[in-house]
């Protein structure tokens, strides 16, 4: 028979009493009233804050967006198919944040910063809020360094600086993504971290962009944030903020970053869907009243940091899709008014074979020549005006039967200038190559060539300069000015190449 020892029992009871935790844990909970279309209505959650994360019984996370008198409207970060009516929901006391680290470079992630490329987990010790306040006036300095896109039309006439926000907009299939991806390819060796945010696109389009980056070695310095067309509206709405948080992480570590939002029209549509399902009152084009704030708080996070903060920068290139070239629609005008300039891609120019299809008349950079090196200012200063005058003259010349010699010469020069701005996709040019190309056109060296020969001649000239006159590239890179020595080298190269080119054409 087992003997019961009173002292052992009393010791056990004493230990249990000492281990007893008198803390009371108060959890803010609620009950699901209804769920569907990515929206849940919750009764309870009395002390929940706007934008707070809530957790459902089966693990789905949501964001409390609508705080009404008798219920809370929550948008779901998932399909929510397992959420049942009457199940419990608890407030987490947190707002959306993501892990950040250098390990994200070269990876493809979703809006929650989870990898979707099948290469395993990403280690991160720090985290950043998805929505963080933009730098203030004192934290910034004016834009003064160029961010080279590698596209002659942009770098010479619509220059972009580090810390600038430049809108790229146009109809579908006009090469908006191509301009953005070419800019990323051109950052190779420039010590710029790139973030490409794909919002609501086809998975095949995103895969194509990622493949291009991998083939050209651009993934080494690029992070791709992707939420495809089949993702919940909540995640499409959050994706740009996730990209901005990652870019900010590098900016505040005194690095230069470039972020591309492709495209903000889809984000606005996702936000409109969420708002209408939450029964918020619709405004113009059925968008909610705060759709301007949706984009302004995102784009204001792009900045050029002050000297005290290490002069890091975050350059934003948002993309917006227009319908039938309507520049005055709601979202395009909103984003135009937020950004420091815009690049308009025209469907008519694209179909006419002018690619990149940049409409120089409507496009503008509000930073201007502050974002150009001195050499580019010296060579390309008048090219935008000349092209604008040519476009006007060309329209007029269609109605005139006989034109004087000066007008004919101006038209011929304009046609050749337009020809030298044409560029193949994924073929960015260095600054020295751009300067040599523009100088050749604006100084009349191409006037004697047929229009069809211009591009072939320029390609050969750039190759000739690289192999026979490497000093030209060195002078531009080191001094950043178009010196007399550089001009002499370039003139000699043009004359030598012109003679060789004419001999080749005669054979």
Swiss-Prot record:
Q: Broadest EC class?
A: translocase
Task: Tell me one Pfam family matched here.
Answer: ATP-synt_ab_C
| A GO CC term attached to the entry | chloroplast thylakoid membrane
Q: Locate the site labelled Required for activity.
A: 363
Q: Where in the cell is it found?
A: Plastid, Chloroplast thylakoid membrane
Q: Which domain of life is it from?
A: Eukaryota
Q: Name one GO molecular function term.
A: ADP binding
**Primary localisation category:** plastid
Record's SUPFAM superfamilies? C-terminal domain of alpha and beta subunits of F1 ATP synthase, N-terminal domain of alpha and beta subunits of F1 ATP synthase, P-loop containing nucleoside triphosphate hydrolases
Give the residue range of the signal peptide: none
Query: For this protein, what reaction is catalysed?
Result: ATP + H2O + 4 H(+)(in) = ADP + phosphate + 5 H(+)(out)
Enumerate the HAMAP family for this protein: ATP_synth_alpha_bact
This molecule's function is given as: Produces ATP from ADP in the presence of a proton gradient across the membrane. The alpha chain is a regulatory subunit.
Description of how the protein assembles with itself and partners = F-type ATPases have 2 components, CF(1) - the catalytic core - and CF(0) - the membrane proton channel. CF(1) has five subunits: alpha(3), beta(3), gamma(1), delta(1), epsilon(1). CF(0) has four main subunits: a, b, b' and c.
NCBIfam families, alphabetically? Answer: atpA, PRK13343.1
Protein name according to UniProt: ATP synthase subunit alpha, chloroplastic
Organism from which the protein derives: Gossypium barbadense
